[in-house]
Amino acid sequence: MARLASMPCWPLAPPESHRLSPPPPLLETGLVVAGHGRHCVVETPDGRRVICHPRGKKSQAVVGDRVQWQPSQDEGTIEKVDTRRNLFFRQDDVRTKSFAANLDQVLILIAAEPEFSEQQLSRALIAAEAEHITPLIVLNKSDLPAPFSLAWERLAPYRDMGYILMPASLKAATDEQLQPIKNQLNGKTTLVLGPSGSGKSTLINRLVHGAQAQTREISQ
């Protein structure tokens, strides 16, 4: 009779295809609220603000992007940019500069003095229309009667085309006088765009409580 030899039995390792891979890292969601070169500031659903860096060029995010990011100590890494509704950008012969995403409207702020460029205004309007973003034109410095009257007259063709135009005196206006602009912005995600000297900082500081302190904090 044949004898069966007893051999020690060792568990076989599973093939490579059956081995369990480590679970993917847990990602948090957030909104990009500021951009500074190669990093940005992401606001979480509970109001925290975290400095995040992109994972390669494909994860490059702009203000207004909804992102998924991975925490790492006191900073984070952006792993994915969610699908955008739109992207406001400027393109020339050299490069494309992205400003913001997922916008409801663009407020184009110009001033009676210094004289605004109709070419720049038209380019901004075309960029907004191309992405189906509503443009709003605000002409600042209505407290300067002569230059304001001339500037308002130059804007007549834009009024005739149906664009919304609003006069303003951002430094001198009372809160009540600024209410029409506030009503236009209420509940909407808006990009404020304009040349140097048009009053962008004044507008934001007048309309957004604590904006000056927040800007100073992010800059530091």
Where are the model-predicted features located?
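Histidine-anchored nucleotide/phosphate-binding helix
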Residues: 119-130, 134
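N-terminal accessory targeting/assembly segments
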Residues: 1-118
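Canonical P-loop GTPase G-domain recognition
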Residues: 144-198
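Flexible beta-alpha connector loops of hexameric P-loop NTPases
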Residues: 113-114, 143, 219-220
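Conserved G1/Walker A P-loop phosphate-binding module
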Residues: 33-49, 55-72, 178-220
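Conserved, well-folded catalytic cores of nucleic-acid-processing
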Residues: 39, 109-112, 127, 131, ...
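Conserved beta-strand/loop subsegment of P-loop NTPase cores
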Residues: 103-109, 132-142, 162-168
